[in-house]
């Protein structure tokens, strides 16, 4: 099982997500428009990331959020890090 970390940047214009391993290698990434709805944008980013890692032995051990909706999404995802840019 590969220990990995999920990072999400939820901005007013775009939402970006990345999954990295312990050596900072990017395992999957996603970039979508927020379209004024950060919750739906994050759902789409997570679905896209999930599809990219499907079938791989990856375990997300920590989540971090940043961006204008960092507190909202960080609370929803129970993020260990909610960081202002």
Predicted segments, located by residue:
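Stable alpha-helical structural segments in soluble proteins, enriched in small hydrophobic residues
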Residues: 45-53
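Hydrophobic alpha-helical segments
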Residues: 23-25, 47, 75, 80-81
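Short glycine-rich, Thr/Ser-proximal phosphate-binding strand/loop in the N-terminal lobe
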Residues: 5-40, 44
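Short beta-strand-loop/turn "lid" adjacent to the catalytic site in phosphate-handling enzymes
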Residues: 30-34, 53-85
């Amino acid at each position: 099982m590969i220990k990995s970390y999920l990072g999400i940047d939820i901005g007013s214009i775009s939402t970006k997500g990345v999954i990295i391993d312990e050596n900072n290698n990017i395992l999957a990434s996603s970039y979508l428009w927020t379209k004024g709805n950060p919750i739906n944008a994050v759902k789409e980013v997570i679905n896209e990331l999930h599809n990219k890692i499907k079938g791989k032995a990856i375990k997300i051990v920590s989540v971090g959020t940043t961006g204008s909706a960092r507190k909202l999404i960080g609370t929803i995802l129970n993020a260990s890090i909610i960081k202002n840019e």
